[in-house]
Amino acid sequence: MGITIEAMKMIRGEAAVAGGSRTKEMVLFGLFTALIAIGAFIKIPVPVCPFTLQLLFTTLAGLILGSRNGACSVGLYVLLGLAGVPVFTEGGGPSYIFQPTFGYLIGFIAGAWLTGWISERSGDFSFGKTLFANLAGLLVVYLFGMVYVYIINNFYLGTPIGVWPVVLYCFVLAVPGDICLCILAAM
């Protein structure tokens, strides 16, 4: 059921020949930055690990905008939040880097880039290949997020946490919903 290669090239601007492609690129940057910010506030309450729709929009940014533009769009979202615009789930500002969840924001940038990079190189936007790209990006997001949670809790906040509790609470309990978002983004 996946999207056609021609349609994806048109969306990414690869088929554009002249003039408005830079404007189109800027509009798509802004659109995905706004969608990610909106996704931060669409919370789906589940026990222990409520999740947001940010992952859906960061994944789609990588798929639709490509590796460079997708990562830049997510990076713009993070920069806006660090500049004080309250676009993160718990507000914004430079002190947000001390929040345990900040690693996931860094992971969103890397995950969008990897998702876009894999989809660009596959040359085929079938469901299976797109899902593979999405899951690879998801793993990168979780890698950055879990490492950051461990480091910030143990070395800055002074609330020691072991590796296994981080894996349990930040991966095992949280990943099923995000896998569903990866499947949704691949459709």
Task: Identify the residue ranges that each predicted region occupies.
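Hydrophobic transmembrane alpha-helices
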Residues: 2-73, 83
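Short helix-perturbing small/polar motifs within transmembrane alpha-helices
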Residues: 3-17, 24-31, 38, 95-143
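Alpha-helical membrane-inserting segments
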Residues: 35, 39, 43, 61, ...
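Interfacial aromatic-anchored transmembrane helix boundaries in multi-pass membrane proteins
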Residues: 40-50, 78-111
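Non-cytosolic membrane-interface motifs at loop->transmembrane helix junctions
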Residues: 50-55, 92-100, 161-171
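Central hydrophobic cores of alpha-helical transmembrane segments
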Residues: 72-80, 132-136
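Membrane-embedded alpha-helical hairpins and interfacial helices in multi-pass inner-membrane proteins
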Residues: 124-187
